[in-house]
UniProtKB/Swiss-Prot annotation:
This is Glutamyl-tRNA reductase. It holds the Pfam family GlutR_dimer. Belongs to the glutamyl-tRNA reductase family. It comes from Mycobacterium ulcerans (strain Agy99). It catalyses: (S)-4-amino-5-oxopentanoate + tRNA(Glu) + NADP(+) = L-glutamyl-tRNA(Glu) + NADPH + H(+). NADP(+) binds at G189, A190, G191, S192, M193, G194. The gene is hemA.
Amino acid sequence: MSILLFGVSHRSAPVSVLEQLSIDESEQVKIVDRVLQSPLVTEAMVLSTCNRVEVYAVVEAFHGGLSAIGQVLSDHSGMSMGELTKHAYVRYSEAAVEHLFAVASGLDSAVVGEQQVLGQVRRSYSAAEANRTVGRVLHELAQRTLSVGKRVHSETSIDAAGASVVSVALGIAERKLGGLGAKTAVVIGAGSMGALSSAHLTRAGIGKVHVLNRSLARAQRLAGKIRQSGVLAEARTLDRLAEVLTDADAVVSCTGAVAPVVSLADVHHALATARRDETTRPLVICDLGMPRDVDPAVAGLPGVWLIDVERVQREPSAHAASADVAAARHIVAAEVAGYLAGQRMAEVTPTVTALRQRAADVVEAELLRLDNRLPGLDSAERDEVARTVRRVVDKLLHAPTVRIKQLASAPGGDSYAEALRELFQLDQTAVDAVATAGELPVFSSGLDAGSGPQGADGPSAGPTPSAPNPSAE
């Protein structure tokens, strides 16, 4: 078994494709359950954000697992496999681990170094764990990933500027409006992104905030927090959107809705009612939703500036300092090496355990033979003989078993477990029983980024009629 990643992100696809693939929280369980219907997939979890849709899975065979995941995403998005392949990237084994570590560290984000993605990884893992779709392999990977993300943010200055998609978008809005002080803003969505937007607006000196949400209670809670910061805030339901837009200078929307919540008619009506245009009072709309919350046609209205995720990516403040990025990548590389060393060591552990069990069985058999040959041996003498024999066996096995774990943990050490089984004629069934009993996880590794496995399942991750083409991101 090994880890397979199938993904599409802002680096490989335009927003229109990400919109089609977007998976909201209510759909994630269904997507994972469909992926797990394949007998070749044993564990799976989905990471779906404004910038990416990625499926991480533990698979028995590369091409079969890849085909199963690709087909589920193709059916979900309505895209043909060929269309999906154009924008997809695939990572396998070591490369999948490295990619997830980099994602959690903010290295693959639209705004490099942002911390929100670490929370998104945590929520994706928690959801998969609650649904029992992650086992030992993805559990350990997710736990290590969260640790790596925290380490990068604590040991580097990659997030020193506190940049995020929200902060960069509002920074653009602030420039367009000549500052946000005493301005009126509309925040659509009262979730985590809405709260983050409100915090940035408050720090920027915004004069008033309208919070809109489907649930009025959630909008009221967020509005209450804003008022505690000394800023005027009102809560509204979404059907009041056209009304509040007439007085808005800036709008931030990130709802996760499957269709636009801000229509061309809404914005046109607001501008016409207030007799606003580009010169009298411009309107800046930050659409941070995925799928998009704002009808793209809004950008064609005079006096409206539409800022989306693609625009945010082009902003200089979305890119961290090269030295900080290099430091973060160094940590990720070291963590990947450490993780894989631990997994390789874990792979040989069941064999070592089986060897020690074989030795214990031999000792017990010989002690029984001794009892039959020397029935007059008293219990004290027998106990001393038993302790002596066990000490001899333990001392003989200690150094080689410790050393073989060290050798197996190094790159290219995959063959040591097999050599040990061959030398001591250990039954593979016994070794498998130890591994299945939960001693330590077994992990198969050994692929470079963007390449497929060598062996029975196929020579490479090249394109096939039923599987997407693994490509460099």
